[in-house]
């Protein structure tokens, strides 16, 4: 059985990308009773796209564009695996900066997703399951896209 959910694009205002190596969360990721995590436990974001509520992001250039998140839940004997596909379309950029690509390839990371109502949620990625993909579409209407795929054993965790 697989459940599918698209978050409404207009409700998402930003996404922070956190390198897993920079994160030291105070709770284990696979305990079902964990419904929230304190904001103070969040490290500085490596990269942000969309509106940046976290002004402490290491990479200061924000990417303006459309953000979409697709969530898929696959249920198996071993448990639930949630897959989150985050896509940002970036108009009028000649190419995605090398500093972004080199910093995110071959890395495990977690995501903080910011919503228009002021709430934020953590997507805790499982080790060795994160994928970073970028593409450049050059022409009269140049655009680029960044896609981040994260697998998790949890639904999105509320940040309080």
Predicted features, each with a name:
Residues 1-9, 153-160:
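Viral virion structural and adsorption modules
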Residues 15, 86-88, 111-113:
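Hydrophobic beta-strand residues in large extracellular and virion-surface proteins
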Residues 95-102, 157-159:
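Short, conserved charged micro-motifs
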Residues 123-160:
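Mixed-charge, glycine-accented linear interaction segment located at domain edges/termini
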């Amino acid at each position: 059985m697989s459940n599918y959910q698209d978050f409404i694009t207009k409700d998402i205002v930003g996404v922070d990308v956190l390198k897993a190596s920079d994160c030291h969360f105070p709770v284990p990721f696979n305990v079902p009773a964990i419904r929230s995590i304190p904001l103070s436990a969040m490290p500085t974001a490596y990269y942000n796209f969309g509106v940046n509520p976290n002004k402490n992001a290491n990479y200061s250039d924000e990417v303006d564009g459309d953000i979409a998140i697709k969530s898929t839940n696959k249920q198996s004997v071993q448990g639930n695996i949630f897959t989150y596909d985050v896509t940002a379309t970036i108009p009028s950029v000649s190419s995605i900066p090398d500093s972004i690509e080199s910093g995110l390839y071959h890395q495990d990371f977690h995501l903080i997703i910011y919503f228009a109502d002021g709430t934020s949620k953590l997507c805790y990625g499982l080790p060795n399951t994160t994928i970073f993909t970028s593409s450049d579409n050059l022409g009269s209407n140049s655009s680029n896209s960044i896609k981040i795929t994260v697998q998790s054993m949890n639904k999105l965790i509320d940040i309080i």
